[in-house]
Amino acid sequence: MANLKIKIADNELVADGDHKALSEYKASFLDFVAKRDAFLAGERFELTEVPREEVIAENPQPAPNVKDEVVVIYDNAGIPSIMRRFSLMRNNELFEGGSTVEHPAFVIGGEVYDEIYISVYPNCNINGKPYSLPGMKPWTNVTIDDAANACFSKGDGWHLMTAPEWGLLANISLKNGTLPHGNTDCGHYHADHSEKGIPIESGSPYTLTGTGPATWTHDHTVTGVHDLCGNVYEFVRGIRFKDGEIQIATDNDAALPETDLSKNGSGWSSMAEPMFVDTSHGVVRFTKEKVENDTYEGGRWKDVECSEYTEGMKELAIYPGEPEVFCGIDGTEGERLAVRGGYWGGSSNYGVFCLNGSNPRAYTYTSIGFRSAYFKRKTDN
C-alpha cells in the first residue's frame, strides 16, 4: 500500500490506493501543473525549475485549429483533477462530410459553450468521489448510474463523460493521425511491447492511470488525454440500444443531472435520422428500418454493414474510424448501455473507436471504469 502526496498551495493531498508505484515524471508534471494554476490564480510560486519543460515543448502539437490546454480544476471537496480544455469545434473540422453545425459536445441545455473540460486520466476513487490523477488505480466495479451520480456529486458542471465527448476525442485523434495506443496486452501495447505502463500491482494486467508513453494519449503528447484505448472499458452517458434502436440524449444534455436517463426516463430520444441495429444476419448492420433481433453480434468495424453513416453517428464515433477494432451490439428486446475503448486483453480489437453495446444497466465489472468531465455553466459569471 502506498500513498500519493501532492502539495498544492498550502495544502497537502494524501490519496490512499493499492498502487505500488508512481511515475516520478508524472508526479513532477502534476506538481508543475498545480503550481502553474495557483500562480495564475494569484498565488506566488517559483516556476523557474519546471520539470521536463523542454520535453513537453518538443512534443508534436495538435493541429492549429484544435485549441486545448491542461488545467487543474477543484471540486466541492477541494481536491483537484487534471483536466484538458477543449475549445468549440464544428463537425466540418472533425470528419469528412460534416456540416458547419457545432459538435454536440459543446451544446448543453440548448446553449453553445465555447469550451468543455475532459479528465486527462480515467478516474480514481477518493472518499467516494472520482478524480483525474496520474499513477492511480482506475475506479471500476461500479454501475453506470452510480458512476454518473458520483460525478454529479463533485459539484455544478461535473458529470460522467458523455457519448458526444468521447466522439469528439475519437474524431480529433483520427483527423490528426494520432489514434491512441494503450494497454491492450497485459500491460503492454499489443503491436509494440516496448510501450508499457506501470502495473497496479505485481503481476496485474491493469496499469496505473497515465503511466504509459505519450502514444497512449489522444494526440500523442504527454499532455494529451490518456488511456482511451485499452486497460479498462469506460462508461459514457447519453447513449443506449433500446429494443434494437440507437437512442441518445439531445446534444450534450447528458452532462446535466436534470436530464432523466433512467430506464424509462424522458431524456431519451431517437437520433435525428433514426437508426436501428440488425443482428440477425451474422454481422452487425445499421439500418433505418426496425427489425426483430434474437441475438447479439460482434466483430471488427470493417465487417459492419451500413448503407450510410449519418452525421449523427459520426458525431459519436459510431463508424469505422478504426476498421480493425471491435464493434459489438445486443439488438434484442430490452435496454443495453454502451462502453468504449476496450480493456487490457483484447489486442488489436481495442481502440478509441471500440464500441460494446451489450451491457444491462446494473452491470459492473473489474474491466469497466469511467472518467468525469466538466463545463462551467453560463450563469457562473
Feature map (PLM): residue ranges:
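Short secondary-structure boundary/capping segments
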Residues: L174-L179, R240, A249-D251
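Short aromatic-cysteine micro-motif
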Residues: V101-L228
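C-terminal, surface-exposed recognition/capping segments
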Residues: G167, E195, I200-P205, T211, ...
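Compositionally biased, non-globular sequence tracts
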Residues: M1-T48
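Extracellular interaction modules
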Residues: H19-S23, V112, T364-I368
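Charged, compositionally biased non-catalytic regions
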Residues: A41-E69
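Extracellular adhesion/carbohydrate-recognition regions
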Residues: I56, V66-G157, D243-F286, G369-S372
